[in-house]
Design a protein with these regions (language model features):
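Conserved catalytic/acceptor-binding region of the Class I
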Residues: 15-94
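Conserved Class I S-adenosyl-L-methionine
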Residues: 66-159
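A short glycine-rich, Lys/Arg-flanked "PGG" loop and its adjoining helix->strand segment in the class I
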Residues: 2-13
Length: 159
């Protein structure tokens, strides 16, 4: 933000996801709860503020940018028939556990070892259910990621 303040002569905008508030709805009953458990474990296992969007307005003020407006926009990622190649690949990664394996270090830091293995087994089972529903063309999933958009005015007379 300090760099925004330094290089801009007028308006700046910051668009930040609130990854702590991501929600999932799915036709696979276990997917919603498992997604939440995995997200919570991941967030405990990383050392990053994933909800920065809610703080941008005050952070603007701290560096001398006058906040003008803040709005939240929800981005929806839908999976429904006909399934894209990305959706099919995602289902395969769930069933194989590959998606969790990509973040195993962070997840293990967020849960104990036995819980990770239990979580991974449940995740793979859920992935197999996703594939079964996809074969029947009945699988639908909506992931909603809230984004905070903050616009501010740089004080160009401050130099």
């Amino acid at each position: 933000l300090r760099e925004f303040d330094r290089v801009s002569t007028d308006l700046v905008a910051a668009i930040e996801p609130n990854n702590a508030a991501v929600s999932v709805d799915s036709t696979v009953d276990s997917e919603v709860a498992l997604e939440a458990r995995v997200r919570e474990a991941y967030l405990r296992g990383i050392n990053t503020d994933v909800a920065l969007g809610e703080q941008v307005k005050s952070l603007f003020g701290e560096v001398g940018i006058e906040p003008l407006s803040t709005r939240q926009y929800d981005h929806e990622k839908r999976t429904e028939p006909p399934y894209s190649e990305d959706a099919l690949r995602s289902a395969k990664r769930k069933a194989s556990g590959e998606g969790l394996a990509d973040h195993e270090t962070e997840l293990r830091r967020g849960v104990d070892g036995e819980t990770y293995d239990t979580l991974r087994r449940a995740w793979r089972e859920m992935g197999r259910e996703v594939i079964e529903q996809m074969q029947e063309e009945s699988y639908e999933r909506v992931e909603t990621v809230p984004f905070t958009v903050t616009v501010g005015q740089v004080d160009s007379d401050a130099d």
